Swiss-Prot record:
Any one GO molecular function term: hydrolase activity, hydrolyzing O-glycosyl compounds
EC number, UniProt record: 2.4.1.18
InterPro entries in UniProt: A-amylase/branching_C, Branching_enzy, GlgB, GlgB_N, GlgB_N_E_set_prok, Glyco_hydro_13_cat_dom, Glyco_hydro_13_N, Glyco_hydro_b
Signal peptide bounds: none
Pfam families in the cross-refs: Alpha-amylase (PF00128), Alpha-amylase_C (PF02806), CBM_48 (PF02922), GlgB_N (PF22019)
Protein name, UniProt field: 1,4-alpha-glucan branching enzyme GlgB
Keyword Transferase: yes
Assembly: Monomer.
Amino acid sequence: MPVLPDRQVINQLISGHYGDPFSILGMHETSQGLQVCALLPDAQEVWLVETENGRRIAQLTLEDPRGFFIAQLTRRKKSFRYQFAVTWQENPQIIDDPYRFGPLLQDIDSWLLAEGTHLRPYERLGAHLMRLDGVPGVSFAVWAPNAQRVSVVGDFNFWDGRRHPMRLRRENGIWELFLPGIEAGQLYKFEIIDCHGQVRLKADPYAFEAQMRPETASLISPLPDVVKSSAARQKANDLCSPVSIYEVHLGSWRRHTDNNFWLSYRELADQLVEYVKYMGFTHVELLPINEHPFDGSWGYQPLGLYAPTRRYGTPEDFKAFVAKFHQAGINVILDWVPGHFPSDEHGLSTFDGTALYEYADPREGYHQDWNTLIYNYGRNEVRNYLAGNAFYWMERFGIDALRIDAVASMIYRDYSRAEGQWVPNYYGGRENLEAIAFLRYTNKTIGVERPGSVTMAEESTDFPGVTLPPDIGGLGFNYKWNMGWMHDTLNYMQCDPVHRKYHHNLMTFGMLYAYTENFILPLSHDEVVHGKRSILDRMPGDAWQKFANLRAYYAFMWAHPGKKLLFMGCEFAQGREWNFETSLDWHLLDDENGWHSGVQRLVRDLNHCYRQYAPLYEWDYQPAGFEWLVVDDHENSVFAFLRRDAEGHELIAISNFTPVPRYHYRVGIPQGGHYREVLNSDSAFYCGSNLGNQGGIDSHHVRSHNHEHSLLLTLPPLATIYLLREN
């Protein structure tokens, strides 16, 4: 007779409340020989089969009608490889027992995961297709240290949490199990009995693929292969290279005209890549494509950080989409959100019954602006989950850069909080020291492990050293969005031209701090939503003046120090605000001679001009690359400045922000010579009035603006011109 486990243990195991299934299930060496136990609800008959020869060794006895089987092999003392021959409702099946396999995580992995320094936690946690002891299947692992029991549930076991409880690795709180015979494409979740005894059904935080909303299950999917970077892609991210970014929301750039449905990743690869290349942008920036439950969040409330959203296709489709951009010589930036996550029940919130991924105190862990939860950056495992995710997108999909969203909300404990609604740090300050340490670690890791890949911060305050290296006290980002420049210049452009002279400093103030960080000048999605109106609609005047103002502003921006970013639709002056539920208004370009087509041609030429002339980008972050020529002509609302590259080539940008043409306008210049007009935003080609300097002009030896040489120019109304000094 077999020695039965304690009846209470059997009851707990069958009811799904026993936390150590490997101590009962599987094959165990006892003083009376080998004992084999199995929990197979609904099985009618179970035989033990020796894998090596296929011989049936013994029939297991049904000790509990709820599916608990046991066999005692008194003549066998040493464990051996085995299978079960199971009869289900008269259907025979040979299965491998998940409980015959040993621990999965290696000691080094356990140590690194607990320490929070595992470079690739996604290689160990989550669901992984593999062969173990020659048996194909999937290894599952999930961090839930306070859970009483965790099971894998899915299509393969009727979503029954009793059937496949997992092994707890007590040294790190990770539950693991290898399930033989499971294949890619099957649905799964983790059924967790939390520390309070409540049952929770959770999606896999490390899932590589997830169901399309509103469904919430994870999909078993292979870990994507490594994508190597290239010298060309690395150079394209450099501070001395031209960086012109086209920001895109994949779900609304263009849609199917017959049903308003999204384009797939592969359809976008065919259409978007060609368009971005035609327009001359060097980079494309994608609003978050991590899996997210709510369309209206635009992806900024992600739950599946490791899964490209199923809205547009599979991970393989997304990988092909990125590769298509790389083939076209365009780098890909991904908006990344490590600052907060939604509180959906199937997600990370109270994962094991405790505030595991989030701060427990709502003054730290709840984001009242967005009704989301804030990651607990003080936990090693949470930092590892996030930092590993950043590296994952770069290593496994070839993402060239990450733009980190809402950095200010991460690094300040009092962000958008009134007095008494936040918790000071250890020193009594307002900085979130844990978040700062996390950002420094992540940026430094990317710099070391993925050379040439960069990070960009959307940071809206004056926090010092955002783009300084962590070793000297900085956050370690490569670039920072210049929100101040964007707000100031847009406020200026919204003024009626007659009043602009009173706000002249709004256009010049940015140069006072332009070299404190490595800035990107952003006209992003945030500026064309929530009643702010489109960029075009903010411009004053009648239709002609609105378009002229916009063209002049874009040309001013492209000449100004700092890399460029433009949200989709702005490149052809879409008149309405962005709507994530519909396509851009491409019909505005039907008239090739219309104003919208003119703006599109201008942006295309600005990009090509920007990439062609090194003075416009090479010394973006060197004071020697910029010089004001006319900075104080507020009466005429004229600005003139010079851009210079490392070899001494010079390009002059002059803007007239009034509708009054300025004839015989003299501008002092450092060097005399012939200056060719390489761009004029008032050109008839862009639907302007076609006033200019007839292609070029020679300087005069006439002193002006503290220079010995000068140019006598015609400044078109509401326009910006570029003049290139020819050797």
